[in-house]
A protein has these predicted regions:
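N-terminal helix-turn-helix DNA-binding module of bacterial transcription factors
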Residues: 1-66, 338
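Acidic/polar helix N-cap motif
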Residues: 11, 29, 105, 162-163, ...
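Short acidic/polar active-site loop segments enriched in Thr and Asp
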Residues: 19, 65, 122, 179-181, ...
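Conserved beta-strand edge residues that scaffold enzyme active sites
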Residues: 59, 73, 104, 130, ...
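Conserved beta-strand positions in the central sheet of alpha/beta enzyme cores
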Residues: 22, 68, 125, 183-184, ...
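Bacterial carbohydrate/catabolite-sensing allosteric modules
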Residues: 1-2, 47, 88-93, 144-147, ...
Length: 339
């Protein structure tokens, strides 16, 4: 007996009560469709087991239907949460996602840009840690690419959070709680260790100190590499062993802050009674640490949506001026600073 005929876009349109063009718009995600219409179309696609023919679509519009997302380190909680939102939003817009880890290596970025030029992918969302070393800084005739993160550049489209202002605000917060000897875990003067994130967050930390009349102490500025929980714990172990006094720690990521909490607990220091601790990123584990972590939060879903929108614009308007979108942040006060 012959198998059931494969459902077509017309079949989906008939079941959903819309035109085939509307179904196409839902599949490609390039034209706004009302949410209630999207819901009907997606329900019809599910009922009919309809699978969009991305290859055929690519032949018609010159696209593969696939983008790449490249992050420096996929193992971090922040990267995992950001990647989840990027993949989810891309799928909602009819795009497949190829995930890459660059290890902060410019050579890997060059390979990805070359792949985009050859139309093996339609575009690239890239998170370089230092634009000065990034392939983007030197590449001519860039394929569609959007940068995310703290890198400061005008070469291509960019989604950022104002890390300097956020770091200043969270440092001001611990100062308002009475702290004066505030350690910064994630930044120092060593240019070989410096990244865009460490530089901007260190600048914000120093801004807040100077605004309060506190002279920064280089002994309290420590940049453990890599930015992992164990390296942060070791850094605080060393700070305690040195005898340098401190009454607060501003960690430049939540991952680092968890290492800070571990070290302080190991040495019998109470948070927040003896030492105030803050993080940055508001990853899920920050809400469940002991004590819960005061941090800087921002909407990763919004980051993903803005990045995909910029990438789609770049794919259709290749000569448009580069745009930068700033996603707002908020100071989230929890028990680690005595809420």
């Amino acid at each position: 007996m012959a198998g059931r005929a494969r459902a077509t876009m017309k079949d989906v349109a008939a079941l959903a009560g819309v035109s085939p063009k509307t179904v196409s718009n839902v599949v490609t995600g390039t034209v706004f469709v009302r949410p209630e219409t999207v819901e009907r179309v997606e329900a019809a696609m599910t009922e009919l087991h309809f699978v969009p023919n991305l290859s055929a679509r690519g032949l018609r519009n010159g696209r593969s239907g696939t983008i790449a997302v490249a992050l420096p380190d996929l193992a971090t909680p922040y990267s995992a949460e950001l990647l989840h939102d990027l993949v989810e939003v891309a799928h909602e817009r009819g795009l497949a996602v190829q995930v890459e880890e660059t290890g902060a290596e410019p050579g890997r970025e060059v390979e990805l840009l070359s792949r985009a030029r050859a139309h093996l992918i339609d575009g690239l969302i890239l998170n370089p840690i230092r634009v000065e070393d990034s392939a983007v800084e030197y590449a001519d005739h860039l394929p569609p690419v959007v940068l995310i993160g703290e890198v400061e550049q005008r070469v291509t489209d960019h989604v950022i959070v104002d890390s300097r202002a956020a770091s200043r605000d969270i440092t001001r917060h611990v100062i308002s709680r009475g702290a004066r000897r505030i350690a910064a875990i994630g930044g120092d003067e060593n240019p070989e260790k410096e990244t865009a994130a460490s530089r901007l967050r260190l600048d914000g930390y120093r801004d807040a100190l100077r605004d309060a009349g506190i002279e920064p102490d280089p002994r309290l500025e420590i940049n453990p590499l890599p930015w992992t929980t164990p390296s942060a714990a070791a850094a605080v172990d060393g700070l305690i062993a040195s005898g340098v006094e401190f009454d607060a720690v501003v960690a430049f990521t939540d991952t680092l802050a968890l290492g800070v909490l571990h070290s302080l607990a190991t040495h019998g220091k109470r948070v927040p009674d003896d030492v105030l601790v803050t993080g940055f990123d508001d990853v899920e584990m920050a809400r469940f640490s002991s004590p819960a972590l005061t941090t800087i939060g921002f909407d990763l879903r919004r980051v993903a949506e803005e990045a995909l929108s910029l990438l789609n614009r770049r794919m259709t308007e290749r000569t448009a001026p580069a745009r930068s979108v700033t996603v707002p942040y908020e100071l989230i006060v929890r028990a680690s600073t005595g809420d």
